[in-house]
Regions:
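Short connector loops at helix/strand junctions that flank enzyme active sites
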Residues: 40-42, 62-66, 72-74, 94, ...
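Short alpha-helix capping/helix-loop boundary micro-motifs
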Residues: 65, 101-106
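Conserved metal-binding segment of the jelly-roll/cupin
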Residues: 110-129
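Conserved short histidine dyad/triad with adjacent acidic residue
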Residues: 45-63, 73-87
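Short, surface-exposed secondary-structure edge patches
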Residues: 69, 107-108
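Short, conserved beta-strand element in jelly-roll/cupin
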Residues: 65-77, 85, 92-98, 143-144
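A short hydrophobic beta-strand segment most commonly corresponding to one strand
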Residues: 69, 116-118, 134-146
Length: 146
């Protein structure tokens, strides 16, 4: 897992194919209406608006074919993280949706506006949660093929 200010994300372009294009598109966005923006090579950016939720009874997710880059544009969220091999499978892998769901303890990291995180296939992650009170957020979820 990588956590950093969005402005510093470009340094990871050599090890994240498709990142340079995604950052350029993200930097040019002025309309944050929820939608999906296709990128080259099957990559995409999803603009998501929501309110953080309680982590109680929440499951972590994992992906095999795409990594998640989640950039908090407005508001904040907390993400839970754990090595995938420490979590128990709660819902088997769905190849069509590229997702499996997992149960188990996670560590929490607060992600403020202007920051982002990247999770790889070996990272279980619980996005969009709160540890105190609900927070509204707008974020870009970038899916990059691995």
């Amino acid at each position: 897992m990588i956590v950093c200010p969005f402005k510093d994300l470009g340094r990871y372009a050599p090890v994240l194919p498709g990142l340079e294009e995604a950052v350029k598109v993200a930097e040019g966005l002025t309309d944050l209406t929820p939608r999906t923006i296709p990128l080259s090579d099957g990559n995409r950016i999803m603009i998501v608006a929501g309110t953080s939720r309680s982590p109680v009874n929440a499951l972590s997710e994992a992906h095999r074919n795409y990594l998640d880059l989640q950039y908090i544009v407005k508001g904040e969220e907390t993400v839970g993280w754990a090595p995938l091999d420490t979590l128990e499978v709660a819902e088997e892998y769905n190849a069509e949706k590229d997702i499996s769901m997992h149960a188990g303890p996670v560590e929490f990291v607060r992600i403020p506006a202007g920051h982002c995180y990247v999770v790889y296939p070996e990272d279980g992650h619980m996005p969009g949660v709160q540890l105190d009170e609900p927070h509204d957020f707008v974020k870009l979820v970038v899916k990059l093929k691995v």
